[in-house]
């Protein structure tokens, strides 16, 4: 279908991130290339609050310990309290345009001293930070001869994968979970070279040893966290990996070309209608929606784009007037029960919200001109 349902307009710069608050489905955060964040109330489709969170492009919005987390090209990660005052600021490396990943109380980022490598941090509820892994070289791990799977290698030689371009955490039932690591997810890392590497993070539990016969005389031994290689694919080489998504717990990747790879066994290669795959979103776990740099959005046989006011007649002039797509995500349906009056009585505000209840998912697309369009799917 992909028909326009509504438009959100308040950003004056290119939209770079859209995030539905998992704590409150009608609460939406959007960010732009100037570092501005807008908090929307989707029941009235109006901003509730906006603030200058960063001084450069915002690359990631997430939550940790029930608090909002943001990450920017201004080399900072910030955590915000309920009034959106910054309560923790972490310096980070933002030489590339990679996102960061948050899983439980862990933060996975490009390494602070090398954009090719990884750091892992643990953030406690009292906001104490522990660095578990420092400057981890993924390329060296892959080239130890421990490669689980390498597909599509072009045979070209280089001594690194280049900078990290994109990261994605995918929960999976195939990962070996033990009492040592308690891990049921794979961290996929897409690189400038076109390589994609899947890593399992091992977090050994501390061991308690009795150094004497006295049960009260014990020594606590903390073992180091480590990565284990689970997957390597180089089908995209030499084109940088631009986006990572999932299809029913299977990785899906896109690059600067028109090639999309579904990383099943064996892999499936799809040739798309356009090059420059900006975004791939998973709809209901079994369907994919594709967004391209040139502004087109493709869902099955349906392809749409948004045009600016027409000023020219030639094809070249028309292409320049297409809105450039910058971000895309699914807005999940809300729970009707959250909109009921606590007294059980009908109120106008509750009825108004009920009319705008998200009874089905919407596709949210952010554009270079600062607009955000919601599409029926």
Curated annotation (Swiss-Prot):
Principal subcellular localization: nucleus
WD repeats: 10-50, 53-91, 230-262, 263-303, 342-377
Quaternary data: Component of the ASTRA chromatin remodeling machinery complex.
Gene Ontology process terms (BP): chromatin organization
Coiled coil: none
Domain of life: Eukaryota
Keywords: Chromatin regulator, Nucleus, Repeat, WD repeat
Gene Ontology CC annotations of this record: nucleus
Protein name: ASTRA-associated protein 1
UniProt family annotation: Belongs to the WD repeat ASA1 family.
One Pfam entry name: WD40
Record gene name: ASA1
The organism of origin for this protein: Candida albicans (strain WO-1)
Compartments in which it is found: Nucleus
Function comment: Component of the ASTRA complex involved in chromatin remodeling.
InterPro entries per record: WD40/YVTN_repeat-like_dom_sf, WD40_repeat_dom_sf, WD40_rpt
């Amino acid at each position: 279908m992909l028909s326009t349902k509504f438009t959100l307009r308040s950003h004056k710069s290119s939209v770079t991130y859209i995030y539905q608050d998992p704590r409150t489905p009608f609460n939406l955060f959007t960010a732009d290339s100037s570092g501005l964040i807008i908090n929307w109330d989707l029941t009235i489709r109006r901003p509730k609050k906006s603030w200058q969170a960063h001084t450069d492009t915002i690359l990631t919005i997430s939550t940790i310990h029930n608090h909002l987390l943001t990450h920017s090209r201004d080399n900072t990660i910030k955590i915000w309290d309920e009034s959106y005052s910054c309560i923790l600021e972490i310096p980070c490396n933002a030489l590339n345009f990679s996102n960061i990943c948050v899983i439980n109380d862990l933060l996975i980022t490009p390494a602070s001293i090398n954009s090719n490598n990884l750091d892992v941090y643990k953030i406690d509820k009292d906001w104490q930070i522990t660095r578990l892994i420092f400057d981890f070289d993924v390329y060296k791990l892959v080239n130890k001869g421990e490669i689980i799977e390498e597909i599509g290698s072009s045979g070209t030689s280089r001594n690194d994968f280049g900078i990290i371009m994109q990261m994605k955490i995918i929960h999976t039932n195939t990962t070996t979970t033990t009492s040592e690591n308690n891990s049921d997810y794979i961290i996929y890392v897409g690189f400038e070279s076109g390589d994609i590497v899947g890593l399992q993070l091992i977090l050994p539990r501390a061991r308690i040893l009795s150094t004497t016969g006295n049960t009260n005389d014990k020594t606590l031994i903390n073992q180091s966290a480590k990565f284990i290689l689970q997957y390597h694919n180089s089908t995209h080489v030499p084109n940088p990996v631009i986006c990572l998504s999932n299809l029913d717990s299977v990785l899906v990747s896109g690059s600067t070309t028109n090639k999309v790879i579904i990383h099943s066994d064996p892999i499936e290669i799809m040739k798309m209608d356009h090059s420059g795959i900006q975004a791939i979103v998973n709809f209901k776990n079994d369907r994919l929606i594709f967004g391209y740099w040139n502004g087109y959005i493709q869902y099955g046989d349906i392809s749409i784009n948004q045009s600016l006011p027409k000023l020219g007649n030639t094809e070249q002039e028309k292409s320049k007037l297409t809105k450039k797509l910058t971000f895309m995500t699914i807005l999940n349906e809300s729970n009707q029960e959250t909109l009921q009056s606590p007294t059980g009585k009908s109120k106008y505000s509750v009825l108004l919200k009920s009319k705008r209840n998200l009874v089905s998912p919407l596709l949210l697309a952010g554009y270079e001109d600062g607009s955000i369009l919601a599409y029926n799917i």
